[in-house]
């Protein structure tokens, strides 16, 4: 079961309160990305883990690949 895209309308980045983008990492795992803060929040068992301590900081190169 995939992440429900309707939730993108109500979830926000916990750091800046900005928009999150649904994306897949290089292993095909879904994650939510904040382009402003360059953070990728994991999605575990279809539940987004919106904790700054669990987020992955994205490099400029990784961020450019995300549309």
Curated annotation (Swiss-Prot):
Top-level lineage group: Bacteria
SUPFAM superfamilies the record matches: Trm112p-like
Pfam entry (one): Trm112p
Alphabetized InterPro entries for the sequence: Trm112-like
One annotated Gene Ontology cellular component of this protein: cytosol
Similarity section: Belongs to the UPF0434 family.
HAMAP family per the UniProt record, alphabetical: UPF0434
Protein name as it appears in the record: UPF0434 protein Patl_1782
Native organism: Pseudoalteromonas atlantica (strain T6c / ATCC BAA-1087)
């Amino acid at each position: 079961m995939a992440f429900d895209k309707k939730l993108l309308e109500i979830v926000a980045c916990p750091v800046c309160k900005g928009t999150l983008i649904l994306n897949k990492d290089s292993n095909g795992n879904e994650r939510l990305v904040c382009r402003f803060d360059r953070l990728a929040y994991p999605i575990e068992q279809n539940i987004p883990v919106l904790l700054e301590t669990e987020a992955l900081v994205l490099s400029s190169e990784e961020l450019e690949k995300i549309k």
